[in-house]
């Protein structure tokens, strides 16, 4: 995690040359042995330590007098010039804030055409229209995802149930602590170059906001044309645990199923979502692309996500005679890891 650490922010504020920034990023990559660079709420977590409670894309931080836009631009260039396979992984400013789709678009523009990956984009695709000042902006966001070649994203789908949100965005987690369920939470930044916040949370279809978050995530999946540009995630565990992936896949592959769930919501969001108007159903091939080959490609894992000769023998075999999509994905016939059978008939 970079973009909130004092050393980097000091370099940027002093006007360090890009090559000096690149040297620092390269050092961090080698020292930590990580596979990529992520920025969480660029500049915002550091600003929070100086009692700023919000930081927009073109707003200067109190301590270093630099903007999130500048941080994203410089880090995106460093990652690109160093040849890191995975592009800069960005958790945008203003997570969860109504109207934040505008700052998400500005963050995308900040990369100036360089490769960038926007993570849990559902949480950054909110408008502020309507009598509740909360609306879907998935159409506006996916327009950018579809038209910008070097832009990819994962969704961070919300599904109903109890979970725990865990984030390096201590600014946002502190703002959310009043919603903790159960009412026990933690935020800290002691000896953290970024931040840390854990807030338990229960998503329910009795909440207008939670129900619309559910719809916004599905809209984002279904409006993104290329499955190589969007990846299946629940931002585990923040939107839902990854064990719910079979249920999510069924929502994407079965329009009747998702329409039925929408109709049975405890709150009526039908006038606030275009979900029913979207007729698309993901194919099995598109699911394979979105969950296997495309993630391997963007991470630079050339031996993964493929059935070609010399690829790793990581293979899942499903029983296509099982009619229920969720059941089929939940109980694979075989899971083979490095050529060894590790799961047979779902166990």
Region spans (language model):
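Conserved, mostly hydrophobic/aromatic
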Residues: 91, 235, 310, 339
